[in-house]
């Protein structure tokens, strides 16, 4: 059975959930300029280092370059990313993990907006902590520490 082209109706969400429960993984596509593909590739290398590739490939089909605001497009299982937003591979990878968590919540029928953002941010922080512990690159460790510090200084209500 093929993964639904769009994930919009109850039936499409149900089919997506069933396929994921059976172990379905997307062949992640990165669509954009060569500079965009390189920058997303660097972020994805960090996702691989932390061991989160399966998580992303379970819920995200495409990471696409756009000229508007970076965001999750649930109905397309896609992350839309503006090239200018890609300036720090650790932060970029964290954004991908955060949006993947939101997609997971959407498919599972959990609240994925409003206060659920806290859950997605916590997943992002978990990822950065894991990356910090798994990487051997001192510069990446430093960026992880800076990233975690920045996120700990942003209290949620």
Predicted feature descriptions by range:
Residues 5-7:
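Accessory helical-bundle/CTD segments and flexible terminal tails appended to RecA-like ATPase motors
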Residues 80-96:
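Short pre-active-site segment immediately N-terminal to the catalytic Zn-binding motif
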Residues 91-107:
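Active-site recognition of the HExxH zinc-binding catalytic motif
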Residues 108-147:
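Post-HExxH zinc-binding segment in Zn-dependent metallohydrolases
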Residues 147-156:
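Short, low-complexity, Pro/Ser/Thr/Gly-rich segments in the mature regions of secreted, periplasmic
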């Amino acid at each position: 059975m093929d993964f639904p082209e769009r994930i919009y109706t109850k039936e499409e969400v149900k089919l997506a959930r069933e396929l994921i429960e059976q172990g379905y993984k997307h062949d992640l596509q990165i669509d954009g300029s060569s500079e965009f593909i390189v920058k997303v590739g660097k972020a994805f290398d960090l996702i691989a280092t932390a061991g989160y590739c399966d998580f992303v490939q379970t819920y995200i089909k495409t990471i696409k370059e756009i000229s508007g605001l970076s965001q999750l497009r649930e109905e397309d299982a896609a992350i839309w990313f503006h090239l200018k937003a890609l300036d720090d591979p650790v932060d970029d990878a964290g954004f991908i993990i955060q949006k993947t968590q939101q997609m997971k919540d959407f498919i599972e029928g959990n609240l994925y907006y409003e206060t659920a953002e806290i859950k997605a941010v916590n997943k992002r922080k978990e990822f950065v902590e894991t990356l910090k512990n798994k990487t051997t690159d001192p510069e990446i460790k430093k960026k992880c520490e800076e990233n975690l510090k920045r996120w700990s200084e942003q209290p949620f209500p």
